[in-house]
Design a protein with these regions (language model features):
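Alpha/beta enzyme core
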Residues: 1-210, 214-234, 241, 247-251, ...
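Flexible C-terminal active-site loop/helix
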Residues: 256-302
Length: 302
């Protein structure tokens, strides 16, 4: 899914059309975010309302539309205890994901940057990731290919039990030792912590999550690679752009415009192509019944 050649840009996606557009533009991987699914599928904030069924239903469509592009699924806090974590890993693999991200928030979880976010104890965090790795190994034993992305939100936690860089580093080291394929922590405070993280973690791959949030500097993939990262996640960029675009079109319609200005719209032919009509027509033509009207199977001797 990831290579060691530079830093892979991993956009966040929340529906099948977004996955299709990313794949058409030759992105190498994507991340289906719980934040995006909760917003687009439920119309709700990311406060634990998108359950396992909602996520795997959305994920099945996203992974199908993504084609050969690997997609990491946001497994949140595993939707319960360790048995739920195991079930989540197996369900995400069955849905077509290449990997699942499991974090150490309490359940039900919420957006890492929201008020009142808390993490579980060290012991519970370790048990959760151990259960995820065990389920991954079960998949691999059956010939499947799957990865575990282990995340800690301890750097941003508000409960006093994990709101520090050193606590986040302890958890990342533990997740690494348990066999997670990728580890990362939310909310690094500047490049000094980013560089220190990569100096202390030895997993094959590390990831940085970036959010377009006031007061936070966004780094380019090249800058991330120079700090030691293998992937940079932009989980909310496409959702944020979509909300802005839809709101602009809505405002234009509210002003009495029956037709929204072209500057806000995708040209019809381009929309037609992006959704895949031409591919569908080519498939219908390739297997047109008219081509088989005179078909007869060859005689078979006994």
């Amino acid at each position: 899914m990831l290579s060691k050649d530079g830093c892979e840009l991993m956009p966040g996606v929340y529906d099948a059309l977004g996955a299709r557009l990313l794949a058409a533009n030759d992105f190498q991987c994507a991340f289906m975010s719980g934040y995006g699914v909760a917003a687009s599928r439920l119309g709700d904030p990311d406060v634990g309302l998108a359950d396992l069924t909602a996520m795997t239903d959305a994920g099945t469509a996203v992974c199908r539309a993504a084609g050969a592009m690997p997609v990491v699924g946001d497994g949140d806090a595993g939707f319960g205890g360790v048995a739920n974590v195991r079930r989540t890993v197996l369900a995400y693999h069955a849905a077509g994901f290449a990997a699942v991200s499991i974090e150490d928030q309490i359940f039900p979880k919420r957006c890492a940057f929201s008020d009142g976010m808390q993490v579980v104890s060290r012991a519970e965090a370790v048990a959760r990731v151990a259960a995820a790795v065990d389920a991954r190994d079960e998949i691999r034993a059956r010939g499947g290919d799957f990865m575990i992305v282990a995340r800690t939100d301890a750097r941003l936690a508000s409960d006093g039990g994990g709101g520090a860089f050193e606590e986040a580093m302890w958890r990342c080291a533990a997740f690494e030792d348990l066999g997670a394929d990728v580890v990362y922590f939310e909310g690094p405070d500047g490049e000094r912590e980013m560089e220190a993280f990569n100096a202390r973690v030895a997993t094959p791959f590390t990831m940085l999550a970036q959010v377009e949030k006031p007061g936070r500097k966004l780094l380019t993939p090249t800058e991330c690679a120079n700090l030691g990262y293998d992937a940079v996640l932009h989980g909310l960029t496409l959702l944020s752009a979509s909300v802005r675009g839809v709101n602009a079109a809505i405002e234009a319609m509210k002003e009495g415009n029956r037709a929204v200005g072209d500057e806000l719209l995708t040209p019809f032919d381009a929309l037609y192509e992006a959704i895949g009509f031409e591919e569908h027509y080519a498939l219908e033509e390739k297997f047109s019944p008219a081509k088989y009207a005179a078909y007869e199977p060859p005689p078979r001797g006994r």
